[in-house]
């Protein structure tokens, strides 16, 4: 009994010793607050030393035309006759200048190529780029695409540029730490940090292609075109937009994923533009209600309601009722995501789609083809109305005119008085029920265009020359 007691006491003393020594060891390993902040391993300075020389500040100058229409209450029949009699336009315009600020990222140090947002350099007459060392240089636009809000500008004969290293945006995860670098409010290079709040965001502007990275890193006006990088200093996105009620940062910023940027810039450098692809489907978001009706366990993807005849989708065997859930083995978050990804690929790219059909996943290879334009960019047809996007206006399946989808501010179309949702039904006294009719008139290269336009309940003439 005495022997057992001695053994028990020995074991107890040993356990107490381990407990005390273990506690002391763990206590010594825990860094103090001072050591935490003094340690270089917890600073972003080393990363920023590599990245900041690749980010530039952009200053833009250009001309803008502001239009003012005579208020409707003063447009009585008598007043209209008086205005017409004296040749006074109902739409008054004045010329002015504008200045804009933005950021950019050096993609190619050898050729001086910089990527930025299309809206940063839109309507620019002069572009000045300031490098991180303070040197200023002139730049020119190589190409841009407003649908993706991407542009490439080029510096002339500038040496010793520092191009940024790229990451793979397909491997990003919500919660990853990120750093935003740009030129907010013209302050110069400014660094903020945060995390990835969400991926595959869309819906900010239904006219454009969107597949954004969302971040809470502070992004403000002037940050557009700047860099969003990971903790290795690799570029993961181009900062593009913020969601804000008053113009300031509220922790909701958006960046274009770098993989999409690479697809777009490759096309701009090769063709001077982005050649939009066509899959040839009509569809919608797959949500929980639709999934319940279809009796499937998938709640994200793109539901196909129609496949266009002889389109790449049709040729490849895709059918109405299919649900696209994978693109190149990556999950598809929404129809908007699929639309943006498809449009950004170079033409003739072969993609692999994961299709859910009859509750089974089937993989289909599709070769993309350039989209046959159902809309026209009028700048290709006639400089008199450049800046407007037009499409056929249909009622009960029949063409009844030409719809103005949107008009860029300050363009000839805007100065003429064209506005979004206008319906053009007559040009130079010729009835135009479709784009093909309109093209016939424009091919005569008229010096003046007289557009008969329906706007809401009003009918008006617009003259451009």
Curated annotation (Swiss-Prot):
Keywords: Disulfide bond, Hydrolase, Periplasm, Protease, Repeat, Serine protease, Signal, Stress response. GO terms for biological process: positive regulation of apoptotic process; programmed cell death; proteolysis. GO terms for molecular function: serine-type endopeptidase activity. Disulfide bonds join 85-91. It is an enzyme of class 3 (hydrolase). It catalyses: Acts on substrates that are at least partially unfolded. The cleavage site P1 residue is normally between a pair of hydrophobic residues, such as Val-|-Val. It is found in: Periplasm. PROSITE patterns: PDZ (PS50106). It comes from the Bacteria. Residues 1-26 form the signal peptide. CDD domains: cpPDZ1_DegP-like (cd10839), cpPDZ2_DegP-like (cd23084). It holds the Pfam family PDZ. Belongs to the peptidase S1C family. This is Probable periplasmic serine endoprotease DegP-like. It comes from Buchnera aphidicola subsp. Baizongia pistaciae (strain Bp). The gene is htrA.
